[in-house]
């Protein structure tokens, strides 16, 4: 069975809010074997919504609507679908009582337009809204399945999980979709694709989908099977083939990002970290502190943007700054070594470079040096030549910092 998600709301078209509902629903539907082939966004306009419905009916078995179930005049999803299907709208007594009770509790007038929220398509299965007012509904008619859900994610998501997914499972073949994401760093998308292109071309179950994002590449392996263990075997077989070829660049699965991996290794090994940031201006430290309980391993950091701060606080020799410059291997080494000493940490890491858009110290944008020192070992400096916008260079430098930290910690 295939589905189309139709998000209703002019605010979506204007870019005032992001359509996070479509992402959530697509992922959930895929997990129960329903393929989403189209996402449509339409404003609060009866005629345009009607055209969107007619088009979706031509190409999808299931139409899933989000938004337009509220009390105002521009909330017209139910009315438009009722007109298109020639179905009557009737009051759902449970929803009507729930909405009425809410207004009584809050001492507000229960107006006719709020009463409208309890209207549902005649003959539909009603999905209770445990976090709002307007109920959702599902209707199987004329060979199509119509699902109507509220727009606010805080209402739609719990409604889907509690009521909608069990309803939808009646329409699936029992063949579910299982996915695993393999994460790679230090290899470009085109380089990785060349190494596994024959696997991508030859696989139908599981499929292999590459995606590049800010210096790293992911491969999503997706298998269909009615049995989870069999799907796991299908995915594992293809994963093994991939890692035989590009395993040196592999670092993790799914949402286990580099900064999570690096901090977890710090905790496991009982080591502490300090950072000195010039180029990245606190981005590295910010990502470090996204990890819960990181105070046990993160001593702190110094944002040393100007040269006098590098010299006075982190004791980079004036001669180094004068002859080699702040953007240099020598400066990166001193920053890493001295922030480690200053904050009494086991590990020091530093970032210096040119974010752009203009050159600095006769060095081009994207010139980056990352210093890393662990305990009493000699400092190591990694040189990078990155491309992209100012923000992309800073973010990618941060990611490279976590990558090199992670790889060094693996060796200990």
UniProtKB/Swiss-Prot annotation:
Signal sequence coordinates: none
A Pfam family matched in the record: CinA
SUPFAM superfamilies, A to Z: CinA-like, Molybdenum cofactor biosynthesis proteins
Classification via InterPro entries: CinA, CinA-like_C, CinA_C, CinA_KH, Competence-induced_CinA, MoaB/Mog-like_dom_sf, MoaB/Mog_dom
Stored Gene3D superfamilies: 3.30.70.2860, CinA-like, MoaB/Mog-like domain
Annotated NCBIfam families: cinA_nterm (TIGR00200), molyb_syn (TIGR00177), PncC_domain (TIGR00199), PRK00549.1 (NF001813)
Family: Belongs to the CinA family.
The protein, known as: Putative competence-damage inducible protein
UniProt source species: Bacillus mycoides (strain KBAB4) (Bacillus weihenstephanensis)
């Amino acid at each position: 069975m295939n589905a189309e998600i139709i998000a209703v709301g002019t605010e979506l078209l204007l870019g005032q809010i992001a359509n996070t509902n479509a992402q959530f629903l697509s992922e959930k539907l895929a997990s129960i074997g329903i393929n989403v082939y189209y996402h449509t966004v339409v404003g609060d306009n009866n005629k345009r919504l009607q055209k969107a419905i007619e088009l979706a009916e031509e190409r999808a078995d299931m139409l899933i609507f989000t938004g337009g179930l509220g009390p105002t005049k521009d909330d017209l999803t139910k009315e438009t679908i009722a007109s298109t299907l020639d179905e009557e709208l009737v009051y759902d007594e449970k929803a009507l009582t729930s909405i009425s009770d809410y207004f009584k509790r809050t001492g507000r007038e229960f107006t006719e337009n709020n009463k409208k929220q309890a209207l549902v398509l005649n003959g539909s299965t009603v999905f209770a809204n445990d976090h709002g007012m307007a109920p959702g509904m599902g209707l199987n008619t004329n060979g199509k399945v119509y699902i109507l859900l509220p727009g606010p994610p805080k209402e739609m998501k719990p409604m889907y999980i509690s009521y909608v997914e069990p309803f939808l499972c009646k329409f699936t073949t029992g063949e579910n979709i299982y996915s695993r994401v393999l994460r790679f760093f230090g290899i470009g998308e085109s380089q990785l694709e060349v190494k596994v292109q024959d696997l991508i071309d030859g696989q139908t179950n599981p499929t292999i989908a590459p995606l590049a994002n800010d210096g790293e590449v992911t491969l999503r392996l997706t298998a269909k099977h009615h049995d989870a263990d069999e799907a796991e075997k299908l995915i594992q077989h293809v994963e093994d083939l991939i890692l035989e070829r590009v395993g040196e660049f592999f670092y993790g699965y799914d949402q286990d990002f580099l900064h999570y991996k690096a901090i977890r290794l710090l905790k496991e090994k009982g080591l502490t970290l300090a950072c000195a940031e010039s180029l990245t201006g606190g981005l590295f430290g910010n990502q470090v502190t996204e990890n819960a309980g990181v105070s046990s391993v993160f001593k702190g950091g110094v944002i040393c943007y100007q040269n006098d701060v590098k010299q006075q606080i982190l004791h980079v020799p004036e001669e180094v700054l004068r002859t080699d410059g702040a953007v240099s291997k020598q400066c990166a080494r001193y920053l890493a070594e001295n922030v480690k000493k200053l904050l009494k940490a086991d590990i020091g890491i530093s970032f210096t470079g040119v974010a752009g858009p203009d050159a600095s110290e006769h060095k081009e944008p994207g010139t980056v040096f990352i210093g890393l020192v662990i305990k009493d070992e000699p400092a190591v400096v990694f040189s990078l030549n990155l491309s992209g916008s100012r923000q992309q260079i800073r973010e990618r430098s941060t990611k490279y910092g976590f990558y090199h930290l992670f790889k060094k910690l693996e060796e200990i």
